[in-house]
UniProtKB/Swiss-Prot annotation:
GO MF entries: nicotinate phosphoribosyltransferase activity
The protein, known as: Nicotinate phosphoribosyltransferase
Transmembrane segments: none
Gene3D superfamilies the record matches: nicotinate phosphoribosyltransferase
GO-annotated cellular components: cytosol
Catalysed reaction equations from the record: nicotinate + 5-phospho-alpha-D-ribose 1-diphosphate + ATP + H2O = nicotinate beta-D-ribonucleotide + ADP + phosphate + diphosphate
NCBIfam families on file: NAPRTase, PRK05321.1
Listed InterPro entries: N/Namide_PRibTrfase, NAPRTase_N, Nic_PRibTrfase, Nic_PRibTrfase-Fam, Nicotinate_pribotase-like_C
């Protein structure tokens, strides 16, 4: 892959539009896996997505120009899958399985266009919503987040001269490489890039991916970014996300359907994929509630991704549950992915080494860590906690409880209803940085 002088590229403002989203597959792999399931099993469900800035002290509408934001969102809507991308999706093997995407699905996807958006301002924040068919709105999540994050980075660097930008990126590269050197100390490490949604920029994410590929070799198991996986000849990695049980729960008409919503999604997922993709995401309505009510067959799945509890604490609870269910944790997989920095990766790896199989998804602290790299402090380069979540399904409000109350989303009255129903056991209030 040709190397790009990122600092020079950032400084050069000569073109009319520098697109942030270059392809519809500049997204996370699990969005495509989930999209096929939605297209096949939930084609008539409508779902709205809403941008949520959890770092409320940062007023995005004061940092990002509305015209620039609309221009990038509009450009993303012009994108279609290329012939090369379609051939790669149809012909490549993913997770050891050929033709994971059905021909009929790919035929539908070949004409896919991102739907319209609604954008306004309120109290210094952008209100960005996507309404319509779930199989269309779901694909806005990653590009919307990537656009907002990169526009914020561009705004923060707009006044910097070429030498200042050179210093900024040189320091960021050195900082990133020092992390690579530390990761080399972990034998048997398996780590992948999960950093698309809150990246500093596409070019910087690509640099980080190439650095990991060269720096730690086989320990780098792939990237969640489909475009980078294709272009860099890497594995595309990812399974499923909270939106699936959130929508299933929102659609529930009875208490029994609500309680079974997470397990219904797992059954649906198993029908479509099975095999190496059987990874449980347990925390949509609290891990404690999920484990309490889980059918025994869940213990036969490959592993869990504890996403919002502290990694060591969350991992221990799942190991205890496997033992209770008569399963050997050493044959199981834990995927850690929540706000990890190098220290957390090393501490978690050493804590569980030899007790369970492990993999790490490294996100924002991989692709957007510029703290201390600018010659003077630039707050706009510090990452923020921003998400794009399902807000309703078929007009019914959607909720995510999480193991961390700071990550809960949904209308307050609905959040309270879910808490009373599922319980608040083992939820730990932690400051959310990214």
């Amino acid at each position: 892959m040709a190397k790009t002088d990122i600092a020079r590229r950032v400084y050069n403002h000569a073109w009319k539009l520098d697109p942030i989203i270059r392809s519809l597959i500049d997204t996370d792999f699990y969005k495509l896996l989930m999209l096929q399931m939605i297209w096949k099993l939930y084609p008539d469900v409508n779902a709205s997505f809403t941008l949520i800035n959890r770092t409320k002290r940062v007023h995005l509408a004061e940092e990002i120009d509305e015209g620039d934001l609309r221009e990038q969102l509009d450009h993303a809507r012009t994108l279609r899958l290329s012939k090369k991308e379609m051939i790669w999706l149809a012909g490549n093997s993913f997770y050891g399985r050929a033709q994971i995407f059905e021909p009929e699905f790919l035929a539908w996807l070949s004409n896919f266009q991102l739907p319209e958006y609604e954008l306004s301002k309120k109290d210094g924040q952008y209100v960005l919503d996507f309404h319509g068919s779930w199989k269309e709105t779901t694909m806005w999540e990653i590009p919307a987040l990537a656009i907002v994050n990169e526009l914020r980075s561009r705004s923060a660097m707009k006044a910097l001269g070429p030498f200042t930008l050179d210093v900024l990126y040189a320091r960021a590269k050195a900082k990133m490489w020092s992390k690579v050197e530390r990761l080399k100390e972990l034998p048997g490490l398996r780590i992948s890039d999960f950093g698309t949604r809150r990246r500093h920029s596409f070019l910087w994410q690509r640099w980080c991916v190439e650095a990991l590929k060269e720096g730690i070799g086989p320990a780098f198991t792939g990237t969640s970014n489909v475009l980078l996986a294709m272009d860099s000849d890497l594995e595309a990695v990812g399974t499923n996300a909270h939106e699936l049980p959130m929508v299933a729960a929102a659609l529930a008409q009875t208490d029994e359907q609500l309680r079974n919503a997470p397990y219904k999604i797992l059954r649906d997922w198993n029908k479509l994929y099975g095999g190496n993709l059987l990874i449980v995401l347990p925390d949509a309505f609290g891990t404690a509630a999920f484990l309490r009510d889980a059918p025994e067959w869940v213990a036969d799945w490959t592993g869990f991704r504890p996403d919002s509890a502290p990694p060591i604490e969350g991992g221990e609870k799942i190991i205890d549950w496997w033992k209770k269910m008569g399963r050997d944790p050493r044959q199981k997989l834990l995927i850690f992915s929540d706000g990890l920095d190098v220290d957390a990766i090393i501490d978690t790896y050493r804590h569980f080494e030899g007790r369970v199989r492990m993999s790490f998804g490294w996100g924002t602290n991989l692709t957007n860590d510029f703290a201390g790299c600018a010659p003077t402090e630039i707050s706009g380069l510090n990452p923020i906690s921003i998400v794009c979540k399902v807000s309703d399904a078929n007009g019914r409000p959607a909720v995510k409880l999480s193991d961390n109350p700071q990550k809960a989303t949904g209308e307050p009255a609905e959040v309270e209803r879910y808490l009373k129903f599922f319980g608040a056991e083992d939820r730990v209030d932690q400051t959310v940085l990214v």
